[in-house]
């Protein structure tokens, strides 16, 4: 009776948090796959725009790739931090046998404050951080959210755009070391020729 009022044990709390971290990690994997799929579509669209002589639209699309790659970097960093939080929690739990309760951890607090800034994780990390604060692991969290849309493309970013344009148009398909069928060889040659023509068009547009 009244078992629902019972305070969760450190083991129960850590198990719950690690389960939530794994769930969020899977969600980030789904986002990464979606970004990769969209990036492939954008690359095809850039080639089409360059072929049509529309460099302005091509560069606008290239900016989307710059932003998507930055988003992927943030997601990979978040995944690594969540894994570190999970390991720190497990280590902290092992210490409860000596201390009797979950100890305060500046490492966990720092990583949680970083994770909470990502819009994708803000809500879940806020709730988890509140529970960790009550459990004595950390102090109050900073609730600032990182605005991914507020990044301006300055000169450095413009260089990134040009780099991506060159990367897309210069790099041909990767050829396997295994022998290719005749029709496959023809397709590879044709794609390289098309990319070379697109690069010439781009240079002409820039001049």
From Swiss-Prot:
Residues 183-207 have a biased composition (Basic and acidic residues). One of its GO terms (cellular component) is ESCRT III complex. It comes from the Eukaryota. GO terms for biological process: endosome transport via multivesicular body sorting pathway; late endosome to vacuole transport; protein transport. Its main location: membrane. It is found in: Endosome membrane. It is a peripheral membrane protein. Residues 174-207 are annotated as: Disordered. This is Charged multivesicular body protein 3.
